[in-house]
Amino acid sequence: MTSTSLTDLFTPTGPATTTCRLAESTRSYYKTEQVDFTLDQFEQSAQSLFVRLSSATIFNIRCDDGYTFTQLEAGGYLGLPDDQTAPAYWIPVSPMVRAINADKSITHEKTAVVSGFTLQGDHSSLQFLCPDNSILDLTIWKFTVNSFTQQFDALSAIDMQGTFLWGSHACVNKPGDLYHHLINGAVYDLRFSWPHNKKCFSENEAHALYTAYSGLEKATGKTFYRFFQQQIVLSVIQRQADDGAWYHGMWTDEKECHYRLHTSALHLLMDELDRTGCPQVKEALISGVAFIAKHHDELDCGIWFLHDSLELNEEAMNSGPFQWISKRTLGKRPSNMLVLNTHLDTTIAINRYQSLTDDLQYAELIKSALVSTRTALDLKPANWLYKPLFWAIGLTMLPTEKARQLAAPIRAIKRIAADFLIKKLPDIKARFPRLVMPNGYIDRELSLRTWAVDYQTINLMDLSRYARAFPGEFNEDILNKAMAFTHDTGLIKRYRELAPGKRYATGFWVEALYHRCLAKGDVKYRQWLAKAMLECHDLGFGMAPSLLGSNSEAVPFARQSLYPVPSNSELNIAVLCRPQGFELLIVNHAQHSVEVNWERKTEMLINWRDATQQPISDVALQIPPRQWVLGTGH
């Protein structure tokens, strides 16, 4: 049996094996023969501890003083002391038993078994069983100031509205949900991923969580959301390899690097650097940018940033789970699949790094990437073939209610497209290379034998970001047409009819519209955004992380201001901080009218309009069922 007390848990014996110090937080590692400790220190009044027991035994935790533990709406259990001068403890999630492989991917997990409970006077203890060939994980917070525990008790509607995650496409609904992702000091994807059925590290998940908690901190003013952000930053820096990379091993049992996840780490570090200027964050960022800048392919027209390290050579591609076509389109290496979204995101990330740090060593690389992007998007061979082809394939993107109205011959063509034409598309693209299709659909890549209709909205999100980062550097008619196609055909409704793993696309549609609203004043984008927010609510996805206005790529930290926050649980908001002025979109997802009550009001003078753009009074502001209002302020 391994036995310890709550007090002793937070005072590990011996010196720390390693320590990471940031501007506002510190992480220290301690190790005994059977237990690993990861201790995060924030203010003097707040600590978080990850405990990992790595041998088959019973783990006994004693509580030597009088405490009352109660279940929290925020998640987990809060322990309040009888002695008001003693610290409080928060256990956000139940202890878990896990199996991990050599790369620390999680291959199995279940809630730990409580093997015993002892109560003697003011002393109590709880025992958990760690089985053979397993580890036992426990996460616990220690607070020494009452205001922190009061924040957990006073949750508002916005605390619980739910946030969509860019990595796992899951939803975090309450504070304790963080620790389903942040495990033993590292951020994991929530899914047991195809094809090896294991939970892998995910900086994409970390970036979404960081953005979500930045927004919730701004919306609520609660200190623990800032602690969550700092803990995520520590976790990302902890995982960075000596060569500057973040490795994942998702598709193979080797440690391949997924560059989209790598650039998510860069964006997260840039968010934190923009806020704090922390030298340690900058050091990790510099190393990460240097790594990703080297991993590109030389096309005839310019450089192309790769999607993952399997694309470095044909042998690595063959070790992965995909079927692919070996082609040298545009002079690319055969193993480069010409994946659009990661190339766009990496270009945005390195350009953002230049703007933030004034380090211009990658300027020529970015210029070259812009040329290759423009070239790839402008590929338009064989219109005579692609126009009828994507008219037919477009029929498969109609929601069922529209498809049922088609004439019988058209429905037959739809079936042929689904059963045959889509399967032939990779070979057609190999003969006539093209990403942007005549009807407005944008394909994910050029050379994989896959069909990823769910990536349409990811492409739109990244192109919307790209258009803001590089105005005039590509034909925005491509983006405008693709946005209109996605909305007008009913593709968003079609997504909810697809397999569960494909429905997430609506969450990225919201992100795309958010960025488009920041760039354009068109009312239609606000209308589309309101509808998309309703769709995400109805599907249980939560709201996109950027909507609370704290995505620092879109709105630098210095420009993020306080805004009015409704207290109604029926309402969701989108905060649009544009150079031309502030906008607040409020959407009522209920089936009844709602009068807006305010959790927080500001001094800002706001003019309100309803969904038909008619002015309305801010006195007893009413929103009809399934409708929205838009406020503008300066």
Label for each model-derived stretch:
Residues 132-139, 143-152, 616-634:
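C-terminal beta-strand-rich structural cap/linker in extracellular carbohydrate-active enzymes
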Residues 248-285, 289, 332-333, 339-351, ...:
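Aromatic-rich carbohydrate-recognition surfaces in CAZymes
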Residues 8, 14-85:
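Long, solvent-exposed N-terminal ectodomains/accessory regions
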Residues 541-579:
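Glycan-recognition and catalytic regions of carbohydrate-active enzymes
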Residues 161-199, 223-246, 282-306, 312-326, ...:
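Long, well-ordered core segments of solenoidal/helical folds
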Residues 31, 35-53, 565-605:
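Carbohydrate-binding surface patches
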Residues 207-223, 264-280, 345-360, 457-473, ...:
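Well-ordered alpha-helical scaffold segments within catalytic/enzyme domains
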Residues 59-130, 607-612:
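Trp/Gly-enriched beta-strand surface patches
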